[in-house]
Structure formats: C-alpha cells, structure tokens
Swiss-Prot record:
Keywords: ATP-binding, Chaperone, Nucleotide-binding, Phosphoprotein, Stress response. Pfam families: HSP70. Residues 603-646 are annotated as: Disordered. Acts as a chaperone. Residues 618-627 have a biased composition (Low complexity). Belongs to the heat shock protein 70 family. This is Chaperone protein DnaK. It comes from Acinetobacter baumannii (strain AYE). One of its GO terms (molecular function) is ATP-dependent protein folding chaperone. Induction: By stress conditions e.g. heat shock. CDD domains: ASKHA_NBD_HSP70_DnaK-like.
C-alpha cells in the first residue's frame, strides 16, 4: 500500500515526514534542510518556494508571500487581517466572496492556492526520497482552527494533488510523536504550541492499554492569530517608530524597507534567545531629498521582552481555560511539551514554567514533532501501524441560532470526535411554513458574535400552532472536525441537510480551476527543467569540445577543427533559444563529430605507450564529467555557527 505522508503546514516553516518500519523519517528537502520556509515568490513567470523564495525576498517584496496561513479561511474584514495589512509588503485584498486574498502581478490569488504551492513542494520532497508517487497525506492545523479554516486547508491539499486523508490538530500530533518516543506509562501532558502564526494549548492523556497507546485529548484552547509573526511585528513597530523619531521618515510606506525590516527583526529575535543584545544595522534603508538614510539600532533582550510581554501573557489565559475544561490542576500535569519555533524564546519558557510549576521538556524537537505525529497518524490510517488509538476533540462549540438571537449549543467544545448529536426544536409562530437553520461556531452567547458557518431552510411544514411541529436538528462532525448538519420534520419525514461550506471559502468550480492551473504550472515547470538540463548538457559539451581540440593540437586536422567549431557555434546559438529538441539535435551532432576524433587520438596514444589518463568518454558531453543529481550533492548556503557551550 502507498505511504501516507505527514505534513506540518506551518506559518513560518513546513515539514514532511513518513513512517519507515517502526521509525519516523523527517525528510530533507532538495536543499538538504529538514524544514522548508513557508514562503512563495512569483518572479519572471516562475514560482519559487522555500529557501529560493526567501533569498530573493528583499529585491521582490511585493511578490514574495509569507505567513499566508494567517489568512486561510478568513474574511477580509476580520480585525486580525486588517491589522496585518499595514505590516506586510504584499497586497491583501477583498475577494468577491468577502475572503482575504492576495494580489500578485495584477492576479488575485486565494490563500488555499498559495498554500498548495508549499504542499506541492512537500509532496515532491517526499516523492524524491521514497522514489514513488505520493497521493495521500495527513495535514496538521492549529487545534483552534474553525470549520472554514479546516475546509480551506483540505482545499489547499486538493489543489496540490493530494487526497487529504485526515486533518489533525498540531498539539495532538506533537503528543503522538512524544508518546511514540517516550513510552513512560500513563500520564497527562500539556502541549504548549506557539508557532509562527498561531497558538494552541491541549491537555492530553496518554494511556497504555494492553501494550497499545491511547492518546486522548481532554481539552484544547488557543488563539489563531497569535504567534512568532506577532513577535516580529512588535519589534518591527518599535524599529519603525525609532527611525521615525530620528529621521522623520515612515518606513511603513516603503515595501522594500519593510521586507528588510522583517528579515532583520526575525534574525534579531532569534539572536536574542542566546545573547543579551544585538545590533540591527540596515544601511541605505531608504532615502529622501537630503540623501540616503541608514538604520542602526541596538536592541537588548530586556527591550524585546518588554515589547512582547503582553503577547506572552496572552498565551497563559488559554492554558488556564484548557486546564479548567479538562477538570485538572497544574499538579495533575506530568509533562509540559513545547512545540513551535517561538517557544524557544527564554521569556516564553520562563512564563510556561512559572504557570505549570515544572520545567518544560527539552527533548522534543519543536520544529519537527508535529510532522512526526502527522506521519504516525498517516501510518495508522494506512494500516502500517495499529498500536495507537487517537481520540481528538472539537475545539469550539457548534450550535444554531434560536429565538432572541441566542446560540443554542448542539455539540459542546472539547467533545470527542467523530460525534453525532441531535436536538428537537419547534416553530416560533402559528402556521409557520419553514424554518431557517443558521449554524454557528464559537463560545459567545449571542449567535451573531460567533463564526457563521452556513445556513439552510427546511420548508413545507404543515400548518400547526407554534410549538407543535417537531424539527429534529442533527450535527455530524467527522474526524477532520468538518461538519454536516441536517434538519428533519418528524411529522412528515421531510429532511434537508448541508455539508457545511462556510459562507466564504472556495466553490468546487474554483477549486477545479485552481487544480488545472496547478497542473498547467507543473507542466511548465517540467518543460523549464528539461530545457535547463538540455542547456547544461550543451554547455558541458561545448566546454569539453573546445578543450579537446586545444589539448589534441596537431592530432586534429584543419577540416575537423572547422567542423567542430561550426557545430559548437550552432549549438551555442541553439542554447539561446527555447527549443529543447533543437538543442538536443545540435548536441548530438557535435558529439558525432567529436567522438571519432577523440577515439582516434585515444588509440594513437595507446599505441605510443600509454594514454596518460586520457579518456574519450570525457568529451561526450551530456552528463559526462558532471556530478550526477543522485550523487546527493546539493548547493548549500553556509552559515558560521558559533559554539555557545563553554
């Protein structure tokens, strides 16, 4: 059976893993890294993903997209989206359906479409490692993602050519990874997941049942717009204000300056986790009538901690609620597991330790644990692993609007999923012919203060006094946390139902169009790679041909030199065009001219008493003399790593 891979689709970085035997393998990407920046760039008709996109961000700020996960499944008018608009160099726009989309090169793109590019990169990374096509995946989402955000994530997978077998909550995935690696008996753990864009906390019970492990989520809470990006933004805001005081220039109006600030803030934040101060030095950050301006600001760890103290404090309240919902106190928690890159910040670790009264565990990789857990769940679904039972919960209450605009819960938050629950309602007026069912998700008592997931109508209700008709409303939530709602008139048996597709989101037609667009891009990418390979082979052959003629000297006749030079010129001209077949034909023509010359020279050298290492195959072009792609050699960036262990 084909492997089901596990993908952590992160705000800042993404990661892919797969179970091999009884071990999970975190798969390195083409650059040799175990995580891939969740950054996509559109440049010269090409789509760049990951490190290549990150490298060119400063010179292409308006077309380089990051932290797109913060927009997925969200409305443009959301307060959190509006806050981000002024802090990112790219353009966030309002789609026709009211969702938050982005605009690149005058083209409107849905967050699902952009996220699909990251998922395609993860898919390709897994395929290159496994040597087989991958079509199925388990993808992680923040535990506090609502129905619209979960559906949007599934849509992104579909656009990327993946059958998403399960959507799994990130803290739950981390607990799966922890449970597999640390078999320490029954215990209750808190997973504190502070990632690039979202925060979750889950209280999870790990139990050993006759050799099998049961991972049961007792409660979950969080904030889907709180993460490392907000920590970066707090520092960016400070730098912008300081520069404004000094130079009277607002850098927020300059996309290029904003992108440079973004990179510098992220770098400084990371440095301040291991040092007490750092200098942010950005020469020529902008210019005005008086000339170029340089930004040089020293930032201490204490200053950064002051800027983000309220953000760290915001993570503690969900921890209190999660414990209360689970009916536990901090003394009941055996282990605290930190997940997400932002959890490396010393202030975060200090506050978590103060709240839970114990030091968080440092033996779980915060960048990889979620992908590892997703891979374990993938193996469970494929039948490769059968000693784990996962019981997850729905993070938010699901209900309908009833008289007076009240939210009447049908499925309470922290209910184990999958789940199905029903409740009987009636009409509010005499002879009412139809009822409108409006489905909401959230914890507010007033229905309209929650997230509207969808609505539908049950009609043809027979005339009757108010309160007499019996309307049974059923909620059915699957293991992905995605909801189906039905309403049935018990007297007539008439039923109406909907698979909740939020009043926003992508239509099936839009998803299909995006899949076709992705497939078209894949074909373009294939053609581009084929053209690049043909050009590389041609260049290698041209170089070796010129070297051969020079090295062989008078062993080559004038006619042969002329023939080689002519063929070289024709091949050089062909490489400047975009016709792969012409390049291949001219390459073969040059090989056919060169081969007899080098073969003859080789034989003459042999007869003369040794070829001195001369090999005619070295001049065949193509891959000859080149490092094979499967030799495992990659281009890499080198960074000096200073050893802090004294």
């Amino acid at each position: 059976m084909a492997k089901i891979i596990g993908i952590d689709l992160g705000t800042t970085n993404s990661c892919v893993a797969v179970l091999e035997g009884d071990k999970v393998k975190v798969i390195e990407n083409a650059e040799g890294a175990r995580t891939t920046p969740s950054i996509i760039a559109y440049k010269d008709g090409e789509i760049l993903v990951g490190q290549s996109a990150k490298r060119q961000a400063v010179t292409n700020p308006k077309n380089t997209l990051f932290a797109i996960k913060r927009l997925i499944g969200r409305r443009y008018e959301d307060q959190a989206v509006q806050k981000d608009i002024g802090l990112v160099p790219y353009k966030i726009i309002k789609a026709d359906n009211g969702d938050a989309w982005v605009e690149v090169n005058d083209k409107k793109l849905a967050p699902q479409q952009i996220s699909a590019e990251i998922l395609k990169k993860m898919k390709k990374t897994a395929e290159d490692y496994l040597g087989e096509t991958v079509t199925e995946a388990v993808i992680t989402v923040p535990a506090y993602f609502n129905d619209a955000q979960r559906q949007a994530t599934k849509d992104a997978g579909k656009i990327a050519g993946l059958d998403v077998k399960r959507i799994i909550n990130e803290p739950t995935a981390a607990a799966l990874a922890f449970g597999m690696d640390k078999k320490e008996g029954d215990r209750k753990v808190a997973v504190y997941d502070l990632g690039g864009g979202t925060f979750d906390v889950s209280i999870i019970e790990i139990a050993d049942l006759d050799g099998d492990q049961q991972i049961e989520v007792l409660s979950t809470n969080g904030d889907t717009f709180l993460g490392g990006e907000d920590f970066d933004n707090a520092l960016i805001e400070y730098l912008v204000e300081e520069f404004k005081k000094e130079q009277n220039v607002n850098l927020k109006n300059d996309p290029l300056a904003l992108q440079r600030l973004k990179e510098a803030a992220e770098k400084a934040k990371i440095e301040l986790s291991s040092s007490n101060a750092t200098e942010i030095n950005l020469p020529y950050i902008t210019a005005d009538a008086t000339g170029p301006k340089h930004l040089v600001i020293n930032v201490t760890r204490a200053k950064l901690e002051g800027l983000v103290a309220d953000l760290v404090a915001r993570t503690i309240e969900p921890c209190k609620i999660a414990l209360k919902d689970a009916g536990l106190s901090t003394s009941d928690i055996s282990d605290v597991i930190l997940v997400g890159g932002q959890s490396r910040m010393p202030l975060v670790q200090q506050k978590v330790q103060e709240f839970f009264g114990r030091e968080p565990r440092k033996d779980v990789n915060p960048d990889e644990a979620v992908a590892i857990g997703a891979a374990i769940q993938g193996a469970v679904l494929s039948g490769d692993k059968n000693d784990v039972l996962l019981l997850d919960v729905t993070p938010l209450t699901l209900g309908i609007e009833t008289m007076g605009g009240v939210l009447t819960p049908i499925i309470e938050k922290n209910t184990t999923i999958p789940a199905k629950k029903s409740q009987v309602f009636s009409t509010a007026a005499d002879n009412q012919p139809a009822v409108d069912i409006s489905v909401y998700q959230g914890e507010r008592k007033m229905a309209q203060q929650n997230k509207l997931l969808g609505n539908f109508q049950l009609g043809d209700i027979p005339p009757a006094p108010r309160g007499v008709p019996q309307i049974e409303v059923s909620f059915d939530i699957n293991a992905d946390g995605i909801l189906k709602v039905s309403a049935k008139d018990k007297s007539t048996g008439k039923e109406q139902s909907i698979q909740i597709k939020a009043n926003s989101g992508l239509s099936d037609a839009e998803i299909e169009a995006m899949i076709k667009d992705a497939e078209a891009n894949a074909e373009e990418d294939r053609k581009f790679e084929e053209l690049a390979k043909a050009r590389n082979e041609a260049d290698a052959l041209i170089s070796s041909s010129n070297k051969a003629v020079k090295d062989l000297g008078d062993k080559v006749t004038e006619d042969e030199k002329t023939a080689v030079n002519t063929a070289v010129s024709e091949l050089e001209a062909a490489t400047k065009e975009n016709d792969v077949e012409v390049i291949k034909a001219k390459t073969e023509a040059l090989q056919n001219i060169l081969m007899p010359i080098t073969q003859r020279a080789y034989e003459q050298a042999q007869q003369a008493g040794g070829a001195e290492g001369f090999d005619p195959n070295a001049f065949q072009g193509g891959d000859a003399g080149q490092q094979k792609a499967d030799d495992g050699v990659v281009d890499a960036e080198f960074t000096e790593v200073k050893d802090d262990k004294k």
